[in-house]
Amino acid sequence: MEEFLSTLRDHDASSVLSSCEPELQELMRQIDIMMGHKRHEWEAEVRAMELSLHNTQEELQSAKALLDKRNSEIRVLGKQLEELHTGKQELVVKYEEQLLHVKEELSKLKRSYEKLQRKHLKESRDGALSREEDRTELSRLNSKIEEFRQRSAEWEQQRLQYQRQVSLLEEQRKTLAEQFSLIQSQGVGRPQEQGQGELQRLRSQLQRAQDSLHAQELELERLRLLQDELGDSIKEQQVSCHAAAHRRGQVLSEEREELKATLDAQDQFVRSTGVQQQQLRREVNRLNQTLQAKEQVIRSLEECLSSPGSAPNLASLRQDLEKVTARLNSSQTCESHLKAEVMRLRDKLESMRKYKAEMSRREHEWKQMEEEHSRCTAENKRLRDELERAEQTRCGEQEGMRKEVFQLTSELHQRDITIATLTGSTSSIERQLRAEVERAERRASELKVTQVQLETLKLENQHLNDLLERVESQSPKRGDGELASLRDSYVSSLKSLEEENRQLRLEMTELRARMEASNQTWQDKYERALLQNQNKNHLYNEQNRADEDVQRRHQEELQAMETQMQERASHYEEQIQTLLTQLENLSRTSPYRPDGQTQESKTSVSPARSSASSASSSSSTRKAQRVATLLSAVANGEEAQASSSDSTGSPNTSVTTRFLEEETLRSQELLQRLDAHIQSMKLENSNTVCKYLGKTGNPQNDVFWQGTHSFCKMID
């Protein structure tokens, strides 16, 4: 333009056209003034545009920084989501292990229930009281089994629900990761409002995921008694969420204020650009009018030049016309430039209008975010109330479970105590049973000795009967009355001894039958005592003391019996010695004693003594020997009385009859005491087995069974 103006000035200096020079100078002056004004305006617009460009660049940088901050927050939230997911998987694994443990306990309870059911079938033959107790126990176990089944079904449903929730959380995590990758890939090129909307949507999804995770935690902690810790963590997370939401609200309010300020500035800029556009339009109209006037002037000049007399100046006028056309072309190019600038300004105005609409949309979204925040606060309050109610229910269930666990631990402790006491008592019971078995063996040996004595008595009675028959055959007319009385006494004593022997055998058979019956009933009593041992633990020490007293009393009675038997044996020996001396005196004074009878008596005494001496291995055998010698002495005395009845007379017969009566009475008393002692032994053995041996589940019953079998064998 300056070159054009300089050319115009040079041309004005050298121009010869005097008529067009002032108009051209005026035109050039106006053009210079207009161009100066336009230059100043354009420079101001350029400065304003640069300032707005700088502001938009700063806003873009702040938006990028905010987007980076949101991306970092999204990464942190993704990490938190992964940590929560791993924690929930661990909790699910733990609860699955607990469910397996509960299933194992349920199987154990089922096995114990089956055992108790079998025991109940065995004990169905018992009384009504035991049946009622078993029914109550079975009903309690059935209720427990049904309760455990219901709990196992609930735990299985909860486990399936947790697995479904974990799968849903895994899908949500994958979708969030994909969205996060898309945001990272497209976050730089997107506008700021879209990034914020996507970020808000992701936050809402993350918040919903966190709410679902919190609900899962509440449900899981209700089962695992860890609600306190998770409640604290939930409260802390809610506080942090509220604080983060408050901070985000403050940041968004500040951004809204900044956007309002930028919108106001842009509105002012748009208004100023509109005013400038109107001024440019007016200026273009004015230039068009001047151009039309100049065209008219040029046409008039051409007409003047076409007239005659203007030929010399035609070349110069043509040159001036070319210059003017060049100027007009330059002005047209300048006008085109101005139009392009106007179009650019219009485009910028349109972009500013779009930006204003976007700002209004953002403001609307901000209002929606505020409404969503208020709704979230209400939802948080509702969730807090539900959490408090769930915590109250959890506390109640926890208290019930604590009571149940305390009851179970007390029962287990009581069971351990009973097991320890029973295991401690088994050794003492075993010792007592061994002592009882030894005592039974000793008494069986004594019974054998008594049987041997009875056999010897039978032999002696038979021998005496033979002697009496021979004496009667030799002297049928002597002392028929005395011999008849002696024979009757011996027959009666023999019958009594046979009757006693038969009674002993019957008692042995009855004892064997009772032992077999007790063997059959002891197993049932043992199984019933297993169920009743818990109620009888406090009576254990008293029963032990009572049994010890009974045993001590029996030992004292045995010792007294032994001392009494020893005293009687000594008394019998003294009487036997006196009788022997009397018989010797009678034999010396008797002239009718045959030698064959003495030899037979000696031979009859010698087998009795030999049979008695064969059993001299213990004190009982010694007693048998004494009784055998006593009976042989009685036989000698009777033979001596039978042979010397004529010489001695009635005093000797009265002594022998009195002695035989005393001996029969004492033998009957001894047998009765032996029978009573055997009965007391049987009662003691049965009571001991029913009280103690049936309480233990150990294989120590074999000791008693072996003892009873050996006792039966010895009796046989």
Curated annotation (Swiss-Prot):
<dbReference type="GO" id="GO:0051301">
    <property type="term" value="P:cell division"/>
</dbReference>
<keyword id="KW-0963">Cytoplasm</keyword>
<keyword id="KW-0175">Coiled coil</keyword>
<dbReference type="GO" id="GO:0000077">
    <property type="term" value="P:DNA damage checkpoint signaling"/>
</dbReference>
<dbReference type="GO" id="GO:0000922">
    <property type="term" value="C:spindle pole"/>
</dbReference>
<comment type="function">
    <text>Required for normal spindle assembly. Plays a key role in mother-centriole-dependent centriole duplication. Plays a role in DNA damage response. Following DNA damage, such as double-strand breaks (DSBs), is removed from centrosomes; this leads to the inactivation of spindle assembly and delay in mitotic progression.</text>
</comment>
<protein>
    <recommendedName>
        <fullName>Centrosomal protein of 63 kDa</fullName>
    </recommendedName>
</protein>
<keyword id="KW-0131">Cell cycle</keyword>
<dbReference type="InterPro" id="IPR031470">
    <property type="entry name" value="Cep63/Deup1_N"/>
</dbReference>
<feature type="compositionally biased region" description="Polar residues">
    <location>
        <begin position="587"/>
        <end position="600"/>
    </location>
</feature>
<dbReference type="Pfam" id="PF17045">
    <property type="entry name" value="CEP63"/>
</dbReference>
<dbReference type="GO" id="GO:0007099">
    <property type="term" value="P:centriole replication"/>
</dbReference>
<feature type="coiled-coil region">
    <location>
        <begin position="38"/>
        <end position="394"/>
    </location>
</feature>
<feature type="region of interest" description="Disordered">
    <location>
        <begin position="587"/>
        <end position="626"/>
    </location>
</feature>
<dbReference type="GO" id="GO:0098535">
    <property type="term" value="P:de novo centriole assembly involved in multi-ciliated epithelial cell differentiation"/>
</dbReference>
<dbReference type="GO" id="GO:0005813">
    <property type="term" value="C:centrosome"/>
</dbReference>
<dbReference type="GO" id="GO:0042770">
    <property type="term" value="P:signal transduction in response to DNA damage"/>
</dbReference>
<keyword id="KW-0132">Cell division</keyword>
<dbReference type="GO" id="GO:0005737">
    <property type="term" value="C:cytoplasm"/>
</dbReference>
<feature type="compositionally biased region" description="Low complexity">
    <location>
        <begin position="601"/>
        <end position="622"/>
    </location>
</feature>
<feature type="coiled-coil region">
    <location>
        <begin position="426"/>
        <end position="590"/>
    </location>
</feature>
<dbReference type="GO" id="GO:0005814">
    <property type="term" value="C:centriole"/>
</dbReference>
<keyword id="KW-0206">Cytoskeleton</keyword>
<dbReference type="GO" id="GO:0051225">
    <property type="term" value="P:spindle assembly"/>
</dbReference>
<keyword id="KW-0498">Mitosis</keyword>
<keyword id="KW-0227">DNA damage</keyword>
<comment type="similarity">
    <text>Belongs to the CEP63 family.</text>
</comment>
